[in-house]
A protein has these predicted regions:
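Transmembrane alpha-helices and adjacent helix-loop boundaries
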Residues: 1-183
């Protein structure tokens, strides 16, 4: 989805570019919690059917994060100097070859830190799905905490989030290190 939104946003076709720009503004400009509520409740109000809670959560979070990733990708593509494309052309690369072998590797290297941040935020934002009734880690910890009159389950949940995000950080650090071939 993010690649499609990025391509639409960078399109030379003005109506498509403006539609993508508006859609990305709409998604990035509204809270994820509101998007979760809308995806779960609005189809039932308008058309008489509703998504399963888990499916609604996946749809809302996928679209939300696709919008953020699309802007990260766009920034990555726009950060590659025009001279790189010209150099690839001089070397005899076709546009497709230049894109695959010259542009994309530079984009991936440049967007890794921002992508890592978004994935960490995604892990933490999973706690928001409880607003539409999806049972997730923090909800279970809160219920357990209320049952046993202790904050220990909440600290355990926090520790789990910390471990998950530590793993995400480690993986992205390894990828970044692998991509920093000039150091």
């Amino acid at each position: 989805k993010a690649v499609f939104f990025c391509a639409a946003r960078m399109s030379k076709f003005f109506p498509l570019q403006k539609a993508a720009q508006f859609f990305l503004l709409l998604i990035r400009g509204t809270p994820l919690m509101l998007q979760l509520i809308c995806v779960y409740f609005i189809p039932g109000l308008l058309w008489g059917f509703s998504f399963d809670r888990f499916v609604a959560a996946i749809i809302a979070m996928s679209v939300n994060y696709a919008a953020y990733f699309a802007e990260i990708y766009r920034g990555g593509f726009e950060s590659v100097p025009q001279g790189q494309r010209e150099a690839a052309k001089v070397l005899g690369y076709s546009k497709a070859q230049a894109f695959v072998f010259v542009i994309v590797p530079q984009v991936i290297k440049r967007i890794m830190p921002a992508m890592g941040n978004e994935v960490i935020t995604l892990v933490k934002d999973t706690a928001l799905v409880t607003v539409i009734g999806v049972v997730e880690l923090l909800h279970v910890a809160k219920s357990a905490s209320n049952r046993v009159f202790s904050t220990v389950p909440l600290f355990v949940a926090g520790l789990f989030y910390l471990i998950m995000n530590g793993l995400v950080t480690f993986v992205f650090a390894c990828v970044e290190k692998k991509l920093s071939y000039y150091k």
